Amino acid sequence: MVDQNPKRSGEPPVWLMFGAGGTVSAIFLPVVILIIGLLLPFGLVNVHNLITFAYSWIGKLVILVLTIFPMWCGLHRIHHGMHDLKVHVPAGGFIFYGLATIYTVWVLFAVINL
């Protein structure tokens, strides 16, 4: 018989942030590394243009996406990796996702005040 009132999990929002972080890390961070690690030092990208972009609203949005989502992905991987290794942290989900939330709020305030 099918349960008419199944217990709902709090995992879907966390998995959304985890999936977004993995996607951002895989697709966009190599481009950031290319720009900051190679093009900028060789003078192929103007620093003034990067700073101007960072102060625009779209630049702030890019900074938020490139910093918040990968952190959620990383902390989610650490949380589940420790569980897979049989290292059970008391209230591990609360600790790791709480750290990710604190980091998110901190980055939001930092970027808004940029």
From Swiss-Prot:
One of its GO terms (biological process) is fumarate metabolic process. GO terms for cellular component: fumarate reductase complex; plasma membrane. Keywords: Cell inner membrane, Cell membrane, Membrane, Transmembrane, Transmembrane helix. The keyword Cell membrane applies. One of its GO terms (molecular function) is succinate dehydrogenase activity. It is a multi-pass membrane protein. It holds the Pfam family Fumarate_red_D. InterPro entries: Fumarate_red_D (IPR003418), SQR/QFR_C/D (IPR034804). It is found in: Cell inner membrane. The chain crosses the membrane at residues 24-44, 50-70, 92-112. Belongs to the FrdD family. Part of an enzyme complex containing four subunits: a flavoprotein (FrdA), an iron-sulfur protein (FrdB), and two hydrophobic anchor proteins (FrdC and FrdD). NCBIfam families: PRK05470.1-1 (NF003977). Anchors the catalytic components of the fumarate reductase complex to the cell membrane, binds quinones. This is Fumarate reductase subunit D.
